[in-house]
């Protein structure tokens, strides 16, 4: 499942890397020098760094600061281990022509693992919130019945239209983060448009985790409504 080498010799490093490259995710912590040649040229002097080699050919070199790597190569990169002294990792791609050479001066540890891809789901998008409302219509109010989603208007798409228990059309605008003034203005445009089509029996409701003070003031002034949505209350 995983392997670890501590303070390995050059022979151990070479054997370990050549046996696992392109098969497992490899992480190396080492003092190294990094040379880059391609659209520009750069040299990073000897320093402790974290080197990641992925089975798809991705190469990433991290220092102790910042999110972005010092150097990297994308999937499809050709990775070679050169049994020189110091031992060298060469990561090369042809379009565009770019080469990273990593001279491993002192390796403190190497790990490798068989990392598998799992399912990835994003929750909290506006489309997910609309889905939640459709599955749990009572979160709007008892008796609410969803009718249509993504309803086209000249001003954009209404997230959801439904009916309340009194037969009023309900226009719902969803925001996944704190609603601003523009969210109220958008909802009001939809509200006016639907009044022209359906008459006076229209309600406009904003669904969001929260809204700004000015947005709340405008919402109340225009006769619209607000329902607070907390994703934690509806997460499986």
UniProtKB/Swiss-Prot annotation:
CDD domains: NucS-like. The keyword Cytoplasm applies. Its EC number is 3.1.-.-. GO terms for molecular function: DNA binding; single-stranded DNA endodeoxyribonuclease activity. Signal peptide: none annotated. It is found in: Cytoplasm. The keyword DNA-binding applies. GO terms for cellular component: cytoplasm. NCBIfam families: PRK04247.1. Belongs to the NucS endonuclease family. This is Endonuclease NucS.
């Amino acid at each position: 499942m995983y392997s670890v080498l501590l303070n390995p010799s050059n022979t151990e490093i070479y054997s370990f890397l050549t046996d696992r490259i392109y098969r497992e995710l490899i992480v190396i912590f080492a003092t190294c020098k990094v040379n880059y040649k391609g659209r520009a040229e750069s040299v990073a002097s000897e320093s402790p760094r974290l080197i990641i080699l992925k089975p798809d050919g991705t190469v990433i070199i991290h220092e102790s600061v910042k999110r972005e790597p010092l150097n990297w190569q994308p999937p499809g990169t050709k990775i070679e281990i050169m049994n020189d002294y110091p031992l060298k990792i060469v990561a090369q791609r042809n379009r565009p022509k770019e080469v990273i050479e990593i001279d491993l001066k002192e390796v403190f540890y190497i790990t490798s693992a068989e990392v598998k891809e799992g399912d990835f789901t994003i929750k909290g998008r506006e489309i997910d919130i609309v889905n939640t409302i459709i599955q749990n219509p009572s979160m709007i109010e008892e008796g609410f019945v969803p009718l249509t989603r993504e309803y086209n208007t000249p001003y954009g798409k209404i997230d959801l239209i439904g009916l309340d228990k009194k037969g009023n059309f309900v226009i719902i605008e969803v925001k996944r983060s704190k609603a601003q003034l523009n969210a109220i203005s958008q909802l009001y445009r939809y509200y006016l448009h639907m009044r022209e089509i359906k008459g006076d029996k229209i309600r406009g409701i904003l669904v969001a985790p929260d809204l700004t003070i000015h947005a709340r003031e405008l919402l109340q002034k225009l006769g619209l409504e607000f329902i607070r949505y907390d994703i934690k209350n509806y997460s499986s």
